[in-house]
From Swiss-Prot:
Carrier of the growing fatty acid chain in fatty acid biosynthesis. This is Acyl carrier protein. It comes from Chlamydia felis (strain Fe/C-56) (Chlamydophila felis). The modification O-(pantetheine 4'-phosphoryl)serine is found at S36. It is found in: Cytoplasm. 4'-phosphopantetheine is transferred from CoA to a specific serine of apo-ACP by AcpS. This modification is essential for activity because fatty acids are bound in thioester linkage to the sulfhydryl of the prosthetic group. The lineage of its organism: Bacteria, Pseudomonadati, Chlamydiota, Chlamydiia, Chlamydiales. One of its GO terms (cellular component) is membrane.
Amino acid sequence: MSLEDDVKLIIVDQLGVDASEVNENSSFIEDLNADSLDLTELIMTLEEKFDFEISEQDAEKLRTVGDVITYIKTRQGE
């Protein structure tokens, strides 16, 4: 399974949205109706899955599904 698929599955599971609603341009707040608690739980799940910590400053910049995928790819390339 690709990184993109992994991230999308986590988002579908955490936010309880339909997979068809999740694409790289989906905004967590505007398109997927996530609130701040949802986003905090999502960040925690991503940290656990990919085994690194996401700083609060970085987390605030992750507004779309694509932002998360790009961030993880960058972190994995370190």
